[in-house]
Every structure is written in structure tokens, then in C-alpha cells.
């Protein structure tokens, strides 16, 4: 496929999404915009002509596209978008320019109805939207509890305040049990299992919460490591040339940074 076509399609779709958000007075993060575009892709379906021109891979942030990110950076460098508290919005001049004509949307009006469903959903402003992306599309079902129970509890004070160590360890065990069997994951699986054993021991001594400060980093590193493996095995063909460097990065991460 012509690589320029990827960027043309993504550029038109990103501009459309930013205009829709501006028109509806919605300001969300770059990562949530990535997920919204991914959801548009998935709802278009594999047989749609645009499906293959919206290349994504799974990362620690969920579905992510380097092509979307590069087009996003280009718009930022051209002062078309502005940031406010980690959310982004289109400036007035760019909105007027971009909303005049969009050949992609004219050719595929179904995108309009799909985007309306996404941007009129109140869950867009909450974790529920992100969680639904994982529940509906993640390549492994345990990625949802791995991310939104194990990992998110380490960064969300509200989740931590309701933490029950036995329940947390049950989720941990389920994730450990469901890890795929792959030679690139062997070393990580051993480390992840050892971490679980240490957490069990701490919990048996009724010291889980007292040691939470020491638990945070290895749990976070576990998610980041697994996400690097998922990227290798769950990506669109556009990224096939990156597999070698991704494998090297994963091996280095396991060797130097894993729990």
C-alpha cells in the first residue's frame, strides 16, 4: 500500500474528529482521541476500504497509532491545537479551515454517524470509555483487569482507598494464570510469578497495605513489560518493520527494568 495514503486518511479523519470535538465543546486527551479513532476504525469493520489505512498497535495506553501521533504533532507544530490540563482542543481559525471541506467524510458519511455515537456518550469523559475499549477489543481478556485493577490501583488514590488485598491478589493470580505461552515472555513470566509469591507472603503477614509503597513500582513495570510484548504480537501490518526493534526493546526492558 502507498504509505502516503495512510497519512492522508489519518490526517483527514483526525481533522474531522478535532472539528467534531470543537463543535460539541469537548476537550479530551490525545490518548482518548487515539481510542476514539480506533473505535471508528473498528466500527467501520474489516471489510471497509479505510480499515487497513488506520494502522494501530496495542501499547500500555491501549490502542495507539504512530501515524495518528505524527499527524497530531504536525498540527501542534502548526499551532492548530492547544493544550489545557492534558486535554487538547482545536483553535478557532483551524476549525474554520478544517470544517469547510473534508473529502474523506464526504466519501464515507457513515463516519459521521459513528462519531456521533462516540462523542455523545457521556462515558467519553470517564474511564468507562477506555475500559470498554479494552473489554470490546483487547487481544486478551485479562488485559482489562491487569490494566484497570492491578495497574490503575497504583496510580489512582480512589481505587487504592477501596483496595482489599485478597481481591487484588485473586486478580493478580488470574492474570498470571492467563499469561500467553511465548518464548519472548518466558523470563517475564518467571519474574511475574516471583512477584506474586512475594505479595502473597506479605499479605499472609498482614503487611500488604503497609508495604504498598514498595509494591507500586514492580506492578507498574509488570504492566509496561507485558504491554511491550502485546505490541509485538498485536499490531497492524503497517508496523511489521518495527518488530525487530520492538523485540530488542522488550528484551532490554525485561533484563533491566522488570520487577
Q: What does each model-identified segment do?
A:
Residues 1-259:
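Domain-edge interaction signal
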